[in-house]
Amino acid sequence: MNLDRRKFFDYSVKAIALAYLSMINLFPKANISGDEKKLPWSSNTFKFPLENFKLQSGEILKNAFLLVDVNGELNQSKSNAIIFATCFAGSHKFNQMAYGINRALNPLKYCIITPNLFCSGYSSSPSNTSPLQDGPRFPSVTY
């Protein structure tokens, strides 16, 4: 994705605004009182290793990983899984505003799997990759 300076600035401002909104808890996770540890459903966040991942460009992203957030549990037939990918400037934390008992995605009914996109800062990104591929050396990623 080629970005001129104006588009880069626009995307950066949007990303900062979304990060700020997630920090001030404008969108609470659920209609329950207390801290997040008292959610009435299971919740787990983990790094999913992809090893040396081949991108569409043919470049290899070394030691790639996705940060994955899972809320709810798979049923026995595994038919209740929902993949809820993050947006370009978002994260699993931003997506959590849709989770809850009286919300669009009920983790007591569905298993909501949220992989963070590459370059999100949570999954493999220019800021958390080895010096051989960090910063401006990070491979070009398409979506």
Where are these regions (language model features)?
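Gly/Pro-rich cap/lid or specificity-loop segments adjacent to the active site
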Residues: A89-Y143
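Short beta-strand element of the alpha/beta-hydrolase
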Residues: S79-C87
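Primarily extracytoplasmic ectodomains and periplasmic/lumenal surface modules that are beta-strand-rich
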Residues: E73-S77
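Generic short beta-strand segments
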Residues: F46-F53
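N-terminal export signals
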Residues: K7-K29
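A short loop-to-beta-strand scaffold at the N-terminal edge of the catalytic core in hydrolase folds
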Residues: L61-G72
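C-terminal segment of N-terminal export signals and the immediately downstream linker at the start
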Residues: M23-T45
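Secretory targeting signals
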Residues: M1-K7
